Amino acid sequence: EPVPTDFREPWLFRVNGSLVVIGFEGHPVPGNAADEQAKNCPDWPDAQEMASTHLAYLALAVVAEEATLVENARTAMKILGSLTRQPNVSAINSAGRLFEPERFRSDVLTMQHSETAFPIFNIVFFGLWQREEDSPLSGYTLGLDRFACPDLEILESPDAPAVIRAQMIAAAMVQITRGAALKDGEVLTLSGTIFKAELKASSAVPGAVTTHLTAIEK
């Protein structure tokens, strides 16, 4: 479809088996969501400033029609990457956090030279937290709902932070590549540890239901 002459009208087009909708919203992201997501950006010192000063945003929806979930996600990231070249773009809001535009675009460009490259950190957030200062680390994801899958949690793991993240990344890719959520009670091996998947109320995200991965054997 041609680009609308009235910026208030959404732009709809199809590409790579997906329906794409881009809309302009002439106001800040509602509910201070950008400010909250800026807190998840320890690697970008300017995130809070970008969140607090933005005046409008572009909303993007990419719906798989004939594309697989992976193909659809790759298309979404490529379109977001192209939007970073628009004038006055200050941040990309994805995966429960904000990205510096050039960094997001740089990650997306890795897909130009590989049909299998999938910069998962641009579309799924992998976080770590503790109940108390001396408690074991727990891990969680945000963003798997776009793949019609519950987000993941690993609670109070004895493993190192890098291992916990690797386990969650592996579990996320299992769901994304097969296009289906882990089944309640399913057993799988991640980074040499056998886990059981169980659907429960989230400990990290109030009100959410997530897939908890519980280690049953090393």
Predicted regions and their residues:
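Aromatic/basic-lined ligand-recognition segments
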Residues: 97-218
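Internal, hydrophobic cores of structured domains that mediate oligomerization or house catalytic pockets
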Residues: 20-123
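Hydrophobic, Leu/Ile/Phe/Ala-enriched alpha-helical segments that form helix-helix packing faces
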Residues: 1, 79-87, 168-177
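Long, low-complexity, Ser/Thr/Gly/Pro-rich intrinsically disordered segments that act as flexible linkers
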Residues: 1-34, 49-53, 179-205
